[in-house]
Amino acid sequence: MKNRSFLLALGAGLALSGCISFGAKPPPFLLRLTPAQEGAAGAARSAAAGQAITVAIPIVGQELMTPRVPVHSGANQVAYLKDAQWVEMPSALFARLVSETISVRTGRVVLDPRQFALDPGIRLTGTLRDFGLDGDRMEAVVVYDAALARGGDRVETRRFAARSPLAAMDGASAASALNQAANQVAAEVAAWIG
């Protein structure tokens, strides 16, 4: 009797396992951002107190709180690109790209927000307003509203935006075009910080 109950339960479990799916099928590959220039291995930097820059992960709207790539169509429609997904949230990828670009282009010491206690000098924060595709114009679009706090007495803000042509509406083309636009914005942010 016990064997029969066990076999019946096992058979039911196997039958159900073919019906249950624990998540969507992953895309064939994941997307990431790469800096146009990378710092040399072993390069040492130092900064006087208050001169290190901390780059915070930007604030994003609900549309970008996913590793998927948004595609805008018309004035009010958003869909997500099929089979395209970032390795992590685009806001974190963008923050690291900006950090690396500032470090390479300015020679400044750039800290991760978790290192903020080491030197709470200059702080770059902001909102990543757009980081996706314009389906009507076949372009990648990056819009970043930056805020730079230099010490406790002054804050500067500036909007940075870049567009890059999109060869095709697929993951590889999206990654390439968004990488190009993000690098352009990161270079402009680095020039602004100086």
Label each residue range with its predicted role.
Residues 20-36, 100, 104-152:
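Surface-exposed short loop/turn segments
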Residues 20-87, 120:
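A structural "domain/chain start" motif
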Residues 76-85, 152-187, 191:
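Short secondary-structure boundary motifs at beta->alpha junctions and helix caps
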